[in-house]
Amino acid sequence: MALNEQDVARIARLARIELTPDQRGRAQAELNGILHLIERLQAVDTQGVEPLAHPLSAHEDITLRLREDAVSEQATEARRAELLANAPESADGLFLVPKVIE
């Protein structure tokens, strides 16, 4: 599957980025290269290959370094107000953000 110029223009519009004609051409070539690589990977026979959860897990024991799931600070109305003071807009104790998905 190859992307054409209209596909790249649509992707740029959805990503909300503006591309010059030269950038659009380079992006088209790079994206088509990535899609070609994906097609090659999909063609590889992986029958009988054990799945990996992590690429290094086949060579060493991987232990996740996670912190204890504990409250680190008591949530108070004063703390909430302090945090919301950093927001450009807030309502009902929540951060308001601009709509980014059509």
Swiss-Prot record:
Q: Which SUPFAM superfamilies match?
A: Glu-tRNAGln amidotransferase C subunit
InterPro entries reported for this sequence? Asp/Glu-ADT_sf_sub_c (IPR036113), GatC (IPR003837)
Subunit-level organization: Heterotrimer of A, B and C subunits.
Record Pfam families = GatC (PF02686)
Q: Which organism is it from?
A: Bordetella pertussis (strain Tohama I / ATCC BAA-589 / NCTC 13251)
Q: Which UniProt keywords apply?
A: ATP-binding, Ligase, Nucleotide-binding, Protein biosynthesis
Q: List each coiled-coil range.
A: none
Listed name of the protein:
Aspartyl/glutamyl-tRNA(Asn/Gln) amidotransferase subunit C
Reaction(s) catalysed (UniProt annotation)? L-glutamyl-tRNA(Gln) + L-glutamine + ATP + H2O = L-glutaminyl-tRNA(Gln) + L-glutamate + ADP + phosphate + H(+); L-aspartyl-tRNA(Asn) + L-glutamine + ATP + H2O = L-asparaginyl-tRNA(Asn) + L-glutamate + ADP + phosphate + 2 H(+)
Example GO molecular function term? Answer: glutaminyl-tRNA synthase (glutamine-hydrolyzing) activity
Q: Which family does it belong to?
A: Belongs to the GatC family.
Q: What's this chain's function?
A: Allows the formation of correctly charged Asn-tRNA(Asn) or Gln-tRNA(Gln) through the transamidation of misacylated Asp-tRNA(Asn) or Glu-tRNA(Gln) in organisms which lack either or both of asparaginyl-tRNA or glutaminyl-tRNA synthetases. The reaction takes place in the presence of glutamine and ATP through an activated phospho-Asp-tRNA(Asn) or phospho-Glu-tRNA(Gln).
EC number(s) per entry: 6.3.5.-
Family annotation (Gene3D superfamilies): Glu-tRNAGln amidotransferase C subunit, N-terminal domain (1.10.20.60)
